[in-house]
């Protein structure tokens, strides 16, 4: 699943995950 590592998408996903987890 790491054929095309989109750092932008990954960063946004991580940020959203942390945001939701922090809530």
Swiss-Prot record:
Question: Where do the TM regions start and end?
Answer: none
GO BP terms, alphabetized: pyrroloquinoline quinone biosynthetic process
Instruction: Print the keywords alphabetically.
Output: PQQ biosynthesis
Pathway in which the depicted protein is active: Cofactor biosynthesis; pyrroloquinoline quinone biosynthesis
Q: Which InterPro entries match?
A: PQQ_synth_PqqA
Domain of life, per UniProt, equals Bacteria
Q: Where is this cross-link: Pyrroloquinoline quinone (Glu-Tyr)?
A: 15-19
Q: Name one Pfam family in it.
A: PqqA
Q: Which family does it belong to?
A: Belongs to the PqqA family.
HAMAP family xrefs: PQQ_syn_PqqA
- What functional role does this protein have? Required for coenzyme pyrroloquinoline quinone (PQQ) biosynthesis. PQQ is probably formed by cross-linking a specific glutamate to a specific tyrosine residue and excising these residues from the peptide.
List the protein's name: Coenzyme PQQ synthesis protein A
Which species is listed as the source? Answer: Stutzerimonas stutzeri (Pseudomonas stutzeri)
Q: Which gene encodes it?
A: pqqA
């Amino acid at each position: 699943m790491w054929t095309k590592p989109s750092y932008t998408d990954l960063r946004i996903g991580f940020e959203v995950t942390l945001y939701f987890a922090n809530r």
